[in-house]
UniProtKB/Swiss-Prot annotation:
Transcription factor that seems to regulate organogenesis in postembryonic development. Involved in the regulation of shoot branching by controlling axillary meristem initiation. Functions in association with LAX2 to regulate the process of AM formation. Possesses transactivation activity in yeast. Residues 40-53 are annotated as: Basic motif. Efficient DNA binding requires dimerization with another bHLH protein. Interacts with LAX2. The gene is LAX1. Its main location: nucleus. One of its GO terms (biological process) is positive regulation of DNA-templated transcription. Expressed in the boundary between the shoot apical meristem (SAM) and the region of new meristem formation. Disruption phenotype: Defects in initiation and/or maintenance of rachis-branches, lateral spikelets and terminal spikelets. The lineage of its organism: Eukaryota, Viridiplantae, Streptophyta, Embryophyta, Tracheophyta. Residues 54-89 are annotated as: Helix-loop-helix motif. It comes from Oryza sativa subsp. japonica (Rice). Belongs to the bHLH protein family. Keywords: Developmental protein, DNA-binding, Nucleus, Transcription, Transcription regulation. Residues 40-89 form the bHLH domain. It is found in: Nucleus. This is Transcription factor LAX PANICLE 1.
Length: 215
């Protein structure tokens, strides 16, 4: 005979005579043997004891139906089997509770890991979007800033355009200026030549001729 966990069950030896044991069990069930002509006592104590024995017998009957193989055992063996069976059920409940708690913790860890992964992905996407937007803004600002400058210096003959070109390429500006435009000469260089008729005609000896004039 084995219990639900596989451990052998050793029935306890009876210390009483079998007849005495059966008599005690019969008393527990129905109050023992009664003579056919005997009348039930109407004493309140006897009635209360009889009802108590009936309730005990009913509880034993229910317990025998719950314990595996209890209907084929005597009262003592059935009680021992009930004790082992209750311990086995308690151990099974403890194991199932531990497994359920472990499963719930694993689900919670998985949910937290998934939430962190989603948050990291969103953060990386936001950073990439910010970097891309900053590059586009810089390019747009450069284009917008260069456009007014080009409009301001777009006049080819204006002073601003010449100053810009001179600042960018002084040597080339000087060469281009020398090739296309020379500075004006001072007015003292140009001497107006006097009409030949105004000069006096002199001979070799320095004498004046009949022509009238002054040098």
């Amino acid at each position: 005979m084995h219990d639900p966990r596989g451990f052998p069950i050793h029935p306890q030896p009876y210390h009483l005579h079998p007849t005495a044991g059966g008599l005690g069990e019969g008393r527990m069930r129905g109050g023992g043997r009664r003579r056919p002509g005997a009348k039930l006592s109407t004493d309140p104590q006897s009635v209360a004891a009889r009802e108590r024995r009936h309730r005990i017998s009913d509880r034993f009957r229910v317990l025998r139906s719950l314990v595996p193989g209890g209907s084929k055992m005597d009262t003592v063996s059935m009680l021992e089997q009930a004790i082992h069976y209750v311990k086995f059920l308690k151990a099974q409940v403890t194991l199932h509770q531990a497994a359920l708690v472990q499963h719930e913790e694993g689900c919670q860890h998985a949910d937290v890991a998934a939430a962190f992964s989603a948050a990291d992905a969103d953060l990386a996407l936001e950073l990439n979007h910010r970097h891309g937007g900053a590059g586009d803004d810089d390019a747009g600002m450069t284009t917008l800033e260069m456009a007014p400058m080009q409009e301001a210096v777009g006049y080819g003959d204006g002073p601003a355009h010449q100053m810009m070109q001179q600042a960018l390429d002084p040597a080339g500006q000087l060469m281009m200026g020398g090739a296309h435009q020379l500075p004006p000469l001072p007015c003292c260089v140009f001497v107006q030549e006097t009409d030949p008729s105004c000069y006096s005609v002199c001979n070799v000896h320095g004498e004046e001729s009949g022509a009238q004039g002054s040098y």
